[in-house]
UniProtKB/Swiss-Prot annotation:
Chain's gene name: cobQ
PANTHER family: COBYRIC ACID SYNTHASE, DETHIOBIOTIN SYNTHETASE
Organism: Clostridium tetani (strain Massachusetts / E88)
Annotated keywords: Cobalamin biosynthesis, Glutamine amidotransferase
SUPFAM superfamilies tied to this protein: Class I glutamine amidotransferase-like, P-loop containing nucleoside triphosphate hydrolases
Name of the protein: Cobyric acid synthase
Taxonomic lineage of the native organism: Bacteria, Bacillati, Bacillota, Clostridia, Eubacteriales
Membrane spanning stretches: none
Family: Belongs to the CobB/CobQ family. CobQ subfamily.
MF terms in GO: ABC-type vitamin B12 transporter activity; catalytic activity
Length: 491
């Protein structure tokens, strides 16, 4: 019987490039003719995605699935932790809400979850040639070792060899790699088969003596040095280079809510060459944007009250008299008349006044809506997904923005979102609403016409993503020892 080949990418800390390296390896293995699956046992992020069957998962594994040529599925990220407040999070297990917990409560659940993960992983072994596993944070969090289910604990559970990645761009990469190895147990050190230096800028010849000294100290080889290069690929943590086109003529501003979620809603906008995207964090940042986006939130009521307290709500209301506003999910709810929370899902407040810019009321329910949708308006097709606890009820005279005709592949007929009578303030529950060409093109061309600019065709975001995935794979393949990697995974 064929044995599944496994490789795990761990890192010296957060944001060292684990996700992007896993993405690259998934595309490389796919290019080489293997069936490959990405996997991360536990992810913590506010950004999430809804699968074709209505399950919720982390965005990083979605991009990795695309790199592998797969439809994203929740088993690729069985545990998703979504922070809801200080020391608290919502646990998503196998794509469905498991419950809310404090950090300590979740820590005490890990043994039980570990057993579930081990059983579930057996199903992956039967479907693929290779699985590329991503760790979280650092394996050297020695206070978490006894119940670890995402780094060395998981590598041991499934008997996966490990490559340890370090970020040279932030400085101290040799100390980070050597220090991490020092804090591992002997068994864990034996599992590490190589290191990867990520985000390198400069002359490799200057780096080589350091690599030799590092190998002498930790007794494992450097598998590759990957250059620093930015790709137009989504970032699950929202670390978006919004100012990439800082001098572009179209100014799009996003309200940076304290509990902002689903940063990836703006990724498709940032690839347009004449668009600049920036965050607004205070009244002083507001300026005169061509489009204002009020994004999703993990706690809509608390974020609305924060906007009210800092004066941004009044700026938004003032801007609505002349500017264009789009609210997405929680942002849509904020633009409505009232937000009612009878079950105290988000707040102790039973009712909170909204901004009053859209003629809808929101009622927060106990059950979360998670669904993939296709929708249209008079002349525009959109697609995306919904993740929300609230339901919006239309008041007299309210006008829906879209008609949803498909939910998770089933025919439906229901309204989504709202648009005001003037047509300049609108809201929708659909995340990813800008990913499709038609709505993005319509919104941007309306702005271009108002600024006497030439209209343009929108860039096909999915095609651009595929091109960038291939470019990423080429870069990583050129700069790491793939023969060595195939050797350690037994291929």
């Amino acid at each position: 019987m064929f044995k599944l080949a496994k490789i795990m990418i761990q890192g010296t800390g957060s944001s060292v490039g684990k996700s992007i390296l896993v993405t690259a390896l998934c595309r490389i293995f796919k290019q080489d003719g293997y069936t490959v699956c990405p996997y991360k046992s536990q992810n913590m992020a506010l950004n999430s995605y809804i699968t074709y069957d209505g399950k919720e998962m982390g965005r990083a594994q979605v991009l990795q699935a695309h790199a592998a040529g797969l439809e994203p599925e929740a088993y690729m990220n069985p545990i998703l932790l979504k922070p809801t407040g200080d020391k608290k999070c919502q646990i998503i297990f196998n794509g469905e809400v498991y419950g809310n917990s404090t950090a300590m409560e979740y820590h005490n659940m890990k043994t039980k979850f570990g057993e579930k993960l081990k059983d579930q992983f057996k199903n992956i072994e039967e479907k693929f040639d290779i699985v590329v596993i991503e760790g979280a944070g650092s394996p050297a969090e020695i206070n978490l070792r006894d119940k670890d289910i995402v780094n060395m604990g998981f590598a041991e559970m499934v008997d996966a060899p490990v490559l340890l990645a370090g970020d040279i761009d932030r400085g101290g990469v040799f100390a980070s790699l050597a220090g991490t190895m020092l804090l591992l147990t002997e068994e864990e050190r034996n599992r590490v088969k190589g290191t990867i230096i990520n985000k390198f800028r400069g002359d490799i010849e200057i780096l080589k003596p350091g690599l030799k000294m590092l190998e002498d100290i930790i007794k494992i080889p450097t598998v590759g040095v990957v250059p620093y290069l930015k790709f137009q690929l989504e970032d699950e943590d929202g670390a978006i280079d919004f100012n990439r086109n800082i001098n572009a003529p179209i100014d799009i501003a996003v309200i940076k809510l304290p509990r902002i979620s689903n940063f990836t809603d703006f990724d498709a906008l940032k690839v347009e060459e004449d668009v600049s995207i920036r965050y607004i964090t205070s009244k002083e940042d507001f300026g005169k944007p061509d489009l204002l986006i009020v994004p999703g939130s993990k706690n809509t009521i608390e974020d609305l009250l924060a906007l009210r307290k800092c004066g941004l709500e009044e700026k938004i209301k003032e801007y609505s008299k002349t500017g264009t506003i789009i609210g997405i999910c929680g942002g849509y709810q904020m633009l409505g008349k009232t937000l009612k929370d009878p079950y105290k899902v988000e707040s102790e407040e039973l009712e909170t006044q909204g901004m009053g810019l859209l003629n809808v009321d929101t009622v927060f329910e106990k059950e979360k809506v998670t669904t993939r949708v296709k929708a249209n308006s008079e002349d525009t097709e959109v697609y995306g997904y919904e993740i929300h606890m609230g339901i919006c009820n239309y008041k007299e005279g309210a006008k829906p923005l879209f008609n949803i005709y498909d939910e998770n592949g089933k025919k439906v007929n229901r309204n989504d979102g709202a648009i005001n009578e003037k047509g300049n303030v609108m809201g929708t529950y659909i995340h990813g609403v800008f990913d499709g060409v038609e709505f993005r093109e319509k919104v941007l061309n309306n702005i271009r016409k108002s600024k006497n600019m030439e209209e343009r065709n929108a860039i096909n975001y999915e095609n651009l993503r595929e091109k960038n995935l291939d470019m990423l794979a080429d870069l990583v393949r050129e700069n790491i020892d793939m023969d060595y990697i195939y050797k350690i995974i037994g291929m």
